[in-house]
Every structure is written in structure tokens, then in C-alpha cells.
Amino acid sequence: MLTANVFVNIPVKSIARAYTYSVPAELSYLEAGWRVFVPFGGRKVEGFIVSVAEKTAEELGDMAGKLKPIEAAVDEEPWFSDKMLQAAQWLADFYLCSLAEMMRLFMPGKSGIKITVIYQSVPEQANHLLLAMPAYRAVYDCLSAGEGLSRGEIGKALPDYKTDLPQILDKLCQYGILSKEYQAGKREKARYEKFAQLLAEVTPELLAEFKRKKAQQHLLEVLSAAEQGQMAFAALKAQKITTATIHNLAEAGLIQIRQRRVLRDSYKDTELTCQPQINLTLDQNKAIEAMTPFLSEGKHHGFLLKGVTGSGKTQVYIEMAKKARAKGRQVVVLVPEIALTGQVVLAFKAYFPDDIVVMHSRLSLSERNDAVVRVRRGGAGIVIGARSALFTPLDNIGLIIMDEEQDMSYKQDESPRYHAKVVAEELAKIHQAVLLLGSATPSLESYYRTQQGELTLLTMPKRIGDMPLPVVQCVDMRQELRMGNRHILSRPLQLLIEQTMAKGQQIIIMLNRRGFSTFVMCRSCGEVIKCKLCALPLVYHKNGKLSCHHCDVTEPVPDVCPKCSSRYIKYFGSGTEKLEQELHQIVPSARVIRMDRDTTNTKFAHQEILQKFREKQYDILLGTQMVAKGHDIPNVTAVGIISADSSLNLPDFRAAERCFMLITQTAGRAGRHGTQGKVIIQTYNPEHYAVTCGIAQDYEGFYEQEMVLRQGLFYPPFSRIVKLLFQHEEENNAKGNAQKLVIAFNEHFAGAKGQQIIGPSPAVIARFRGIYRFVVLIKTTDLPAVQEFLREQQLHLRADVAIDIDPIAML
DNA sequence: ACTAAAGAACTC
DNA sequence: AGTTCTTTAGTG
């Protein structure tokens, strides 16, 4: 019998294994990689075939009689290639998650199908006692009238019973009065456009026949000029040609109205404003020469391109992409945030106008699907986007570029908690592709790996045209306070703003906190108002609401303190909203635009804000760290960083690294075109090496000092970290389970070097929705051994434990 | 995640 | 006893 091993697309750890199905004769063409529709339990779900095998009854053993047949195929071709399956399997093993959970990342949307339940009446039960009730009778009669309807359709037909329809339907199914059927439909919608196709040759004689039908004559002329005599209705409409005219001409048999699929692409009309750089610098050439042999021979290798801001890393990316495309291989270009795709698309479009698709999670499902279709048809070979672009179905990747490789947003912070760098590296290995990590300030991990010889370091230390780096000035905020300035804005920064505006130039100001006030406290009893779900302080926003930046929950500001009923409630700390207000007061003539998560909810909000700023409609761009990333605005000559060190006091071993990178990156935004920029950094820790090295743009200096600390504390890159989060309603159970694991770990690794386990300790959000959370941290030099140990302990199958490999937040 | 079956609580 | 709500096991 022909059988298939199938992983069902259900994200539950306890069923993270293959189930065997029989393959009916009419589906005998199915192979590994196909998405299918299968019966599972009492319902039908999507599944992924991972292998197909001919099996005898003996081989099947006692399962022989229990096999259910695969119902249908979801697509017309296999969705997962062998390489994709291989990558998904490796990643599932590495991150200790289920294969299905990993595989569903390789599709746009979590599932390829939408399953609807269709209810049908059972005729034999027409006189069931339960149907004496009017509501039940109405539903039954409604279904008896026609074919069978979904819940939504019944609700539409019987609006009176809509509210308790679910209960009615459940009940009727329970008694067998109604039957259920599961129907799978495509989730995404293909879009079509109508177009006119010219059938005849347009000769002067033919046009003469339409002397008295001017509109149709015009249409003929337009179509004869068009490519292949085809033109979309939308384009014709733009030329004031009505559908009536088109239909008339179709009646006459001279044209044909047809339909074709259009692939949506909201980046299609990106204007080509980028000037191609013609002469490469010496450094650029060196970098390209180092990588080219590997690309030409189709050999995997990893490179770290360390180039200061303005050294022309993008041009290196483009040159390498050209070479990969010339060999017929595909290219993936990753950026840390969706907002930065526009920038890269712009640069690449100048060289590859039609060879690009954009892929990220803010696109609609259909749009992502259209992008996949374009890639599959060979309509584009360069995928640009955020993390999720890595999972585009590509069969021949030659080059993976990861810009700003140090950026923490490359780590997915929900399950499966993968790091794009790990995925990129594994894909590069499987495809024998070149991996190119780019950064001005590489992560300590990557830089360390170049010293270990695992990656090849390429450097570009000079800015193009040898432009000077900006002048950086540090302002000690303690000093400011002593001088009597209690504003967020120091006087030197205020002065810089005024001077810059006087010259007609622009300023970027970065404050790493959104909202108005960072916490709200009662002055009588000291109670800080906290989120009901996670107990973290709520942030006050100017719209009068308190919001939790962790759970995205908002609530109104209470009139009196919830603890002591005092009316003395005050706002402390400052965010971007408050700074915006203060700027208006201190520099009334300044036109300020704010960019943070609150003002960038829509797909193109980032681009719109930056565009307005670029067009000089505003003087000051004020925002959170997103203003520090990758934008190049010529007229910006000054940058202010409000509290560069706010992260230094966090309980995170990467605090110093974060602070250093924030300063270097933000400072890099100033003065990229001719004029030397000026940067002011406000800090309470002017002596800290992260601040001093940041100001001096001294990566090596920072690296050396930080590495000493990391080694002393056995932190990455000298170890790798695995975070385990234990959750339980009972505090003691959560803690006890964690404790048990710690004991088992110590037993297992007794005497082994390079293994350390810490905890359990309460998580930052110690209690979430009534569930207690404890954290255990493992530091190891032998990650595979730890992964193996966790698998032995069956930890990856437990619903109450979340495993995070290479976590970003420790607690 | 969802279903179906088994068990516990509740109504009459 | 009959019904309804809750818990639990199992999905090929």
C-alpha cells in the first residue's frame, strides 16, 4: 500500500510527529513537499507530506487497519522543495520546536487553506423532539431548503437567532440532527484584470471605416501603438476611453476582451531616484574580489563586511547581487525592520528594475502570495525584506545578504524563536551560497567569529570621498541639573538646534522611549500604576490614556490613586510625546515631526514621514531608535541623542553593546553630504566606556573592553545561552519544575567543563494572566550537548516550558 | 487546536 | 434519572 508520512499543521507540541496516511490511487503522484488536506481526529486539517513509501501490511503492523486516506492536495505542485524541507528539519531540531511549526514559516500565512464547516440537515431526523423549539426548527428548515451552509451564511439568513447560533448548531450536531462537513478553500485571492486584445491589423483603410465612430477609431489607434496590441482596462480608462467603447469594438469582432492574473506589488512604483555609483572605491573592489571566487564556484562561505556609515556597503551588495544573478542564482537581501525595505528597494531598483520582490509581514496575505508566484515563475530573482523573506520558496539561492547584522530585531521574539542569522547561515550551507553580513558595528558574536576564522572579515574603514566623521560632543546631564536646567533638553543641544535651523538645515533627535511619561505615580503613597496583566508600569500618553508597551493594553487614567484614593497623581519620566511638547515650547518656530510606533502603524507610514522630512516640510525629526537606522537624508547636519545611556542600567549583559551601537549609529546620521555634521549626546554616565568609545567611534576599543567582561562572566561570544521559561498557575509548581530541571542538568553535566546553569528566578513579567513564570538560564560552550539533553528530558514536548535559544532578553 | 468521550455537578 | 457543564485523552 502506498503511504505518506504527514505532519499536521497544528502548532501543538504534543502532536509534533509524523502521522501515516494511505495515499489513494488517484493521488499517487503525491511526493514529499506537497501540502494536503487530511482527516485528523474528528475533523479535517492541512498537513505536509515529508515522505512517501510503499508499505506492506506487515510493515504497518497494528496500524494497518487504522490508516485514513489523504483527502486531497492543496496545490497543483509541491510547496516545499527538498532544500526547504531539509532547512525546516534542521531548524526544528536546532530550536527544539515541531517540524510543522518550522514548515509553516515557509508559507505566506500560517496555513495554505481556510477550513470552513458546512452544516447539513439529516432528513431522517426531521421529526426529532428537539425541533419543537422554534429556534432549532428555523435552523433545520433553513438547512433543509438548500445544499448546506456555513455558520456565517446561516447567521445571515436568520439574523434573529444569530447570537446563540453556535450553541444551537453544536446541540443539533450532538443529536445527529445536523451533520458537519469540512471544506477547504484557498486563503488568498488571485487578482485579475481585464484587458483588450487587438485581433486585426490596424490599417489606414480600417481606420477609415470608423470615420463616424471617433471613439472606437481612437481606441484602435491606441491599441495598435500598444505592446502586442494589448492594453489593460485601467490604462485605457486613464486615456478617457470608456468601457462602452471597448464593448462596441469587441462586438464588431476587432478586439477581444480577456482576463489575466495580475500580481500585486505595492513597491512597483518606487521612483528611480538613486544615482548609480559608477566608480568603485579600492575598499569596495577588495571586498568584492574576496567574495567572487566563492560565488563563481558555488561554494558556501560566510563574510562579515565591516564598513563605517557612508563607506558604500550597499554598492557592494549590489555588485555581488549582479554577479549572483549573472550566474542565474537567486539573492535574498535582509534588513532588520520593515521600515528599511523601502531604502534598499530604492537602491536595488536602479540596477534591477524588474527583478525584485519585496517580502515582509506587513504585506497582505494575497500580496505575499503574489510575490511567491512571481518568484516561482521566475519573474524575479531578488527577494528584499525583513526576517520572513528568508522563507520565500527559492530553489537556487546563490547569495544571502544581511544588512545591519548586529540588529537585535533579527531575532523573532515569539515562537518559533529563530534568529535570522542562524536561518540564513543554514540556508546558505544547503544552497552552497555566499553569506554576507554587513554592519558598521558588528555584533560581538560575529566579530569574534572572524577572529576564530569561521567568517572572513572584510573592512571598509573610509567614507566615500573621505568625508569627515561628525564632531561629537558629550553633555553631562548631572552638570546640567546642577546649573539649574531641569528640562529634557540640555542647553548645548538647544543651542545646536537653533544654530542648525538658522542655517536652514535639519536635525534628528533620538529618545528611546515612546509615550509621554514613562510611569505614573501617586505622590501620597508612592504607588506606581501598573498593567493588570503583566504588572509592568503603564506609560502615560497625551491622548489621556495609560498604555502597557508590553501587552498593548490601554486604560483611562484614574482620578484618584487606586491604593490610597489620594488625588495627587503625578507623571514621571519622559517619552517622545513629552519631548515633542517641550520642543514646541523651547523652540516655537521649529516644525517637529514625530516617528515612533504610535505614528507608524500603517504599511507606508515610515516612508511618508521620512519623505515629508526629506522634502524639508519639517526641521526636526524626533523619534525612538527607529530614526537611527539606515536613512540617508542629505540636509541633516545635526543629531541629538537624549539619553544614550538609558539602557545601561538594565539587567542585560548586552546593555553596553546596545548603548555603544545606538550612539555610533545615530551619530552616523549626521552630515553625510559635504558638510561636517555635529552630534550632541546627553548622558548621566559620560565616563562609561560604551559612551566614550561610542563618541570616539572606536569599535575596536569598545570590543576589547567588552570582551574582557564577557569572558569573565562567561557570556556570549564565549558561551551560548539557552533560556527556559517555566509556567504554571501554582507558583510552587512553576518554581519546582524549574528546580527539577536544574538538578537534572547538574547531574547530567556533573564534572563537564563549559556548562553553567542559573536559576530559577522570577521572570520580568513574573505573573502573566494568573500564571507564574520562572526562568532558568543555561550558558554553554557545547550547545549540541545541551540541545540533546533537553530532548532527552522531553522538554521540547512540554506545553508549560518555552525554550529560547540565543535569547535577546535574559529575564 | 479541536473533538469526542468520560466524569462531575446540577436540576427535577 | 436526565441534563449540562468540565475535564481529559487522543488525533494515523
Q: Positions of the model-derived regions?
A:
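Generic solvent-exposed, charged/amphipathic alpha-helical segments
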Residues: Q89-A92, G155, Q494, E580, ...
